[in-house]
Amino acid sequence: MTNQQHDHDFDHDRRSFASRTPVNNNPDKVVYRRGFVTRHQVTGWRFVMRRIAAGIALHDTRMLVDPLRTQSRAVLMGVLIVITGLIGSFVFSLIRPNGQAGSNAVLADRSTAALYVRVGEQLHPVLNLTSARLIVGRPVSPTTVKSTELDQFPRGNLIGIPGAPERMVQNTSTDANWTVCDGLNAPSRGGADGVGVTVIAGPLEDTGARAAALGPGQAVLVDSGAGTWLLWDGKRSPIDLADHAVTSGLGLGADVPAPRIIASGLFNAIPEAPPLTAPIIPDAGNPASFGVPAPIGAVVSSYALKDSGKTISDTVQYYAVLPDGLQQISPVLAAILRNNNSYGLQQPPRLGADEVAKLPVSRVLDTRRYPSEPVSLVDVTRDPVTCAYWSKPVGAATSSLTLLAGSALPVPDAVHTVELVGAGNGGVATRVALAAGTGYFTQTVGGGPDAPGAGSLFWVSDTGVRYGIDNEPQGVAGGGKAVEALGLNPPPVPIPWSVLSLFVPGPTLSRADALLAHDTLVPDSRPARPVSAEGGYR
């Protein structure tokens, strides 16, 4: 290689921006990696550029201070701050836009949060969002605008439904769970007084000392003010405590405790059953037309084999002698019949299993009227809370009612009770317990287990008020124009009228009522109660 060629290659390598990083460790024959410049080369180039700029601008290349670099950093920070502000403003405009009235039907004043609804060319002040949605016919949300934007429209009269709910958030539960409790002297959650009628919506809490379902053979003896009743197996049966044939047959004994007073709200929520009296048997005392050693109306017995899973034992079965045959009865009904008239028999005549099999079978008596085993009464001094729990899972054909008893209300910890101002007026409950912030879209049904859900539609709020819904049909079961406007999702949750009637009656939610104009609103004539500024009632 000539010196001229060597100088040309050296000059090319010196002027190129290729990396001069060696890729081998042989000092005799160094091979350089070809590629981009290294970080050290870049920082060195930047330093040279700053030094040249300092020499031109400051006439000093010593660079004891570097004011030009401080200025560039300040400019960069300013640009970053401006960009951050622009991004923040964009995000804020998405979260809280400065709305325009446009074609929006429901508007809200940004400064006062007052609601307005457009009807035709006029802008009407509206009492609440529920009324505005009924007027518009769909569940719209208000568009927040400035007051100057609202002043551009001609103003109309005040319209809306006084007392309509401000917020209607439907509870996600589709199962019907309604509980009515009556406490004599029971603390509710948080130590509040639990005396009176309490309506609970949703699943119950039955842990600890809270009211739980009555056990087998348990019952509650109550006084409704018009008679004595026995609460058992999800129903209430009239009972005469002076009829010792019945009380003894039920296992109450001679010393029956005084019945507890029951509130009408709980009393009406429990379905009525036939009275607990000795059944009337036709031709009682006459000889039977079939071969039994007892007259009609008497009781006979027989032994039957019972398989308990581990052992097989003999059990006594009782039969009532009826005009057309024998009917198997429970020990309680057998005791009631014998206490009423044993027909001179010290013991029920015993028949063989083969003899019973040959005799005709009768079904004259309604054995469901009577408990299948002797009952034990709940000690109301220890368990002063009595409840009726009505439930119907979604899709179920029948409902069920369970009686509860305990020392405290079965209110879940996450649910707080609301004391009703109109408690006791027109059968209104003392308090309600619903999940805060949600309500129930309901439909009334009968109290019976097979009652169909074809009643009126109601909205039950978390403050204990029931609002009737104008259910103008629209082709969907449980749905209508008002239901669609309010944004409610069918199907409604069934609720017995005996439970629904315990809520405070509110106005009907309909478009016709929402379009009523007002000059002013008269004070509420219903009972009121002042609330202190610190919270609670005075």
Swiss-Prot record:
The chain crosses the membrane at residues 75-95. One of its GO terms (cellular component) is plasma membrane. Belongs to the EccB family. It is an enzyme of class 3 (hydrolase). The keyword Chaperone does not apply. Its EC number is 3.6.-.-. Keywords: ATP-binding, Cell inner membrane, Cell membrane, Hydrolase, Membrane, Nucleotide-binding, Transmembrane, Transmembrane helix, Transport. InterPro entries: T7SS_EccB, T7SS_EccB_R1, T7SS_EccB_R3. Its main location: membrane. Induction: Repressed by IdeR in the presence of iron and by Zur in the presence of zinc. Gene3D superfamilies: Type VII secretion system EccB, repeat 1 domain, Type VII secretion system EccB, repeat 3 domain. GO terms for molecular function: ATP binding; hydrolase activity. It is a single-pass membrane protein. Residues 1-16 have a biased composition (Basic and acidic residues). Part of the ESX-3 / type VII secretion system (T7SS), which is composed of cytosolic and membrane components. The ESX-3 membrane complex is composed of EccB3, EccC3, EccD3 and EccE3. The keyword ATP-binding applies. It is found in: Cell inner membrane. An ATPase. Part of the ESX-3 specialized secretion system, which is important for iron and zinc uptake or homeostasis. Residues 1-25 are annotated as: Disordered. This is ESX-3 secretion system ATPase EccB3.
